[in-house]
Structure formats: structure tokens, C-alpha cells
Amino acid sequence: MTGCVPRSWRPWFLRSGAMLACFLATGAAAQISIDIDETQRISFESGNFDVRRYSGEMQGVSYFVDNKLVMTADQIDLETGGQPKEGSFFVKSLEVINAEITGEDLLFSSAIARNVDFGVLLGEHSPVRNVSFDAGAAGFFDDSFLQVLGIEFSDELATVTVGNVETLDFVFDQLPTGERYARNGGLLIDDLRFDLGTVNREFKELADTLAARGLRAAEFDFAVSQIANFVGGELRAEHAFNLVMDEMASLELVSGFEVKLATLVALESMAAQGRAKESEMLNLIGGIELASLNATYLDAGLVDTLVDVMAAEQNVSPAEMRSSLRSMLTQTLEGMLPRNGRRMARPLETLLKQGGGLEVSVRPQQPIILSNFLGFLIMPDLALEQLGVTITHLRDQ
């Protein structure tokens, strides 16, 4: 794990974070309105803000770009370590209350930050810099904390609400070469809900079928976390991903990786230089090994719902659909994996027939270099055997 923020979410966080950092770094003294530059302006209705300390409070805040309102907030309370310096803007505490990003249909009820260097955080989020093992956590410290509550955003396809997003406890340490790494870190997201908006005509029948079975919205809780330690000349990291779909299913994924010290140093060097060649990145794969992987899926109605939906679409009974799926699954796996297909298919068939859950385990006799996975694609049967892959059906509790 290179940080605590999933990569696919970074553009949204960075766009909002960059705008907020520019917003706060300008200062506001006692004026009602301040021109930041030729295009940006901040105004607030009341408050007490000390531009020398870059600290204070503002109420009724508005942020404009090219005279267009971009963001509003009921209140902002800010305490910093002083004026921004080159590449650094340390925020001791920040609270933003009832903010709205205008034109984006995005708002949140509260955002809190403690002991975060926003200058470093925003400066480290280029694609090249993210090759660094620590880049995703740049700007954070052992006592850092971020939390956003009551997030809402929508478009014509869906409305998304998030009850709570917060960072888990950070613990940082140093490699023998002096580079920093995160021993502990992570992100927690509670009450993530997708409500379908306008459904395209070709999907309306499916949406109606799902709604009839109680799936008018999808609700999730999930967390990602990392535990890492430097042992015997390599960094051993365990990453965990937990996902719960309310009253439907849950998934836990735990992986273990081992990264050679020379590889970590090379990653840091690439990040510092601001460049990375594809050939260099491929060579580094030889220093990263998969030690273990375990996935546990527990079903609490999701499989039944999906089978019912497919049966309704094909105008057959759920029992017929289950039988058809089991046959298709067995034929497909036996065709792809002549030696192991039947063994892999059996627990999946049992899940379709009886419910319950699945545990997929990868336990190689010794850690597998990631570059070997290219060869495994050509010989999948051999891959399963060398990786020690097993699938076990879990009975319904």
C-alpha cells in the first residue's frame, strides 16, 4: 500500500483539497472581501482572521474564480503553523462547516483536519511521485487526522451519500537508509449509499426487478489498512480490505507482500527525480514478492437476489437458473484448468446450491516474485499449483 487513499479516489480529493488549500492560504484579515489574484477572490460576512498567523475564524465564506462562485461554507476555523513556505503549509487544526462546491452538486456537513501539511500532501500527488512507497501518506504524521462527514453528490445517474470518511491511526518509521514508511495507516468509510437516479431505458427492467427485491439502493461500509515492518533486509507489509454490503454480503481481502530494501530505495529515488521509465519500473517488480493472499466472502442474500434477477430476465425458474449456472461454471473452469478445474468448481457449485460463503487462499511454499505472474497467465494450472490456491465453501452460520 502506497498510502491510505485508494488511487481511483485521488482526483476528487485533490481537486477539492487544492481548491481548499488555495482558499485558506490567502488570509483574510478584517476585510469583507479580498482579491487573491486577478482571478480569485474570497469574501466572508463576519469573523476574526489574523493573516500574520494564518489563523482565525470566518463565517459566511464564499470563494470566487473569474467572478464565478465556486465554493461556500457556513464557517471555517483554522489554526496553522504560520504562513505558507515553499512546498509546505502545516495546518494544526481545521474545521469547515456546511460547505458546498457549486456547479458540482457536491456538499459536506463537516470537514476536520489535524496536524497535516497540505503543501506537501498536494505536492506529492503526481503519477511519478506516487511510485514512492510513502507518497500516498506524504504530509501526514503520527498524530495526523482527516475526517469528512455528511458528503452528498449526485448526477442524473445516481445520488451518492457518505456518512463518514476518516483516516485510521498513523504510525511512521524509518528504513535503515533514512526513508520514511507507514507502519500503520488506513481509511474508513461508513454509510456509503448509492441511490439510482434516472435509469436508461435498456436498464429500466433490471432496475425494476432489483427494486422489487429490495435493492433500491446499494449501501456499503468499507475500510483499507496497512501494517508493515522492516525485517531481515525487507519490508513486510500486510494490506487488508474489508467491504460490507448491508444485509447482502461481506468481503475481506488480506494480502502479504515483501519488498526488498534496494527496491524501496529505488522507488524513493524515482520519486525524488520526478521521473520513472517503464523499463525501470519493470525491473523493480523483481524486488516485490507475494507472500500470501486470503479472501473471505460471506453471502447473506446477494447470490439469491442475483439468481432471481437473471431467472426473471430469461423467463425461467430460480432453480433452473441455479442448475444452468452450476453447469456453465463447471464446464468453463474444467476447460480453462484441466487439472484443477473440477476442484475449483466444486465449492462454487455448493455456494450456488446452499448459500454460505467462500474462502480463497493463496499460500505459496515461498514468496512469489511478481514478474512470475506474467508466465502464470500462459500456464494457469501450473500457477494454481505453485501458488497453493485453494477454495473452500463456508457453511451458512
Predicted regions and their residues:
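Glycine-rich, small/hydroxylated-residue low-complexity segments
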Residues: 31-397
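N-terminal signal peptide c-region/cleavage motif recognized by signal peptidases
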Residues: 25-27
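N-terminal secretory signal peptides that target proteins for export/translocation
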Residues: 1-11
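Sec-dependent signal peptide recognition
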Residues: 10-19
